[in-house]
Amino acid sequence: MKQALLCMSHSPLLHHLDPPADVKASVEAAFDQARAFVHNFDPDVIVNFGPDHYNGFFYDLMPPFCIGYKAKGSGDYDSFAGELNVPEAMAEDLAQFVMDQGLDIAISRQMEVDHGAVQPMEIIYGDVASKPLIPVFVNSVARPFVKVARVRKFGEAVGAYFKNSDKKVLFIGSGGLSHDPPVPQIATADEAQRKMLTDGRNPTPQARAARQQRVIDTAVKFAADEADIMDLNPEWDRGFLDVCASGRIEDFDRYTADDMDAVAGHSSHEVRNWVAAYSALRACGEYEIAYEFYRPIKEYISGFAVTTAILRDI
């Protein structure tokens, strides 16, 4: 088995707000399953599809996709803040291959990734830099969005590059399912918010702390059914997980940005990272789900899922 997959939700609230004990225990059990799966597979290289929450990518230049040749963590919510262990030559070769498939992407020699990208690695390995990892940014919060079909094709191109590799490759997709946290939208942002969305790099510790506290406060209210944000949508979440499990990746194409906003929240677009990861695995062959966990968790403001998948023996 040369390719495998781990897709999982992330939440900056994991270490800031606890759900009920039974829910927290079920999440920890899911993380244990994910750790065992990944450590048993023991990848040589990891391709990490992840979003950003205006910590590394901003409206001054917002690509739909970006492959990092070098990268560091932003350290938001006390997440990893060091240099990632990026195999630079492989990342360069991957980017050129994807472009040769007719997909226009960006590259970065100085990528900054936030909690949304690094949290799976923190959970699985502790040290994000412990394994060679190619960071792949997929725009998941900033309109305008490319069609989901384009995300699928991008993922397939990445997978095609690794299909015949002599390396064991793990595709990670990081993103919450239905959720609508208090992330400003450019269409309704005030002047200060527009400035942050356009170029909010290097915030002061006080500004970052205030921004993060707003999210934590919203989560507390949301768990008490007092927050003015969209509720989670378990039905939508389970429907999306069914598509992931089916292997019919063309079915991802039916998802549209407007519908996702309306029924699953403005940050449900983070499932684009799942689409890319599952499409990458499917490009390597038919797959089957090895493990699936799902709970709607208000304390994390997220439809929260963990899945692993392996290629079928044919």
UniProtKB/Swiss-Prot annotation:
Q: Which UniProt keywords apply?
A: Aromatic hydrocarbons catabolism, Dioxygenase, Iron, Oxidoreductase
Entry keyword Iron: yes
Coiled-coil features, chain-numbered ranges: none
What pathway, per the record? Aromatic compound metabolism; 3-phenylpropanoate degradation
An example GO biological process term is:
3-phenylpropionate catabolic process
Q: Which SUPFAM superfamilies does UniProt cross-reference here?
A: LigB-like
**Active site annotated at which positions?**
115 (proton donor), 179 (proton acceptor)
Reaction(s) catalysed by this chain, per the record, are: 3-(2,3-dihydroxyphenyl)propanoate + O2 = (2Z,4E)-2-hydroxy-6-oxonona-2,4-dienedioate + H(+); (2E)-3-(2,3-dihydroxyphenyl)prop-2-enoate + O2 = (2Z,4E,7E)-2-hydroxy-6-oxonona-2,4,7-trienedioate + H(+)
For this chain, one GO molecular function annotation is:
3-carboxyethylcatechol 2,3-dioxygenase activity
What are the EC numbers?
1.13.11.16
State whether keyword Transmembrane applies: no
Q: Which family, according to the similarity comment? A: Belongs to the LigB/MhpB extradiol dioxygenase family.
Q: How does it assemble?
A: Homotetramer.
What exactly does this protein do?
A: Catalyzes the non-heme iron(II)-dependent oxidative cleavage of 2,3-dihydroxyphenylpropionic acid and 2,3-dihydroxicinnamic acid into 2-hydroxy-6-ketononadienedioate and 2-hydroxy-6-ketononatrienedioate, respectively.
What HAMAP family has UniProt attached to this entry?
Answer: MhpB
Protein name as catalogued:
2,3-dihydroxyphenylpropionate/2,3-dihydroxicinnamic acid 1,2-dioxygenase
Q: Which gene encodes it?
A: mhpB
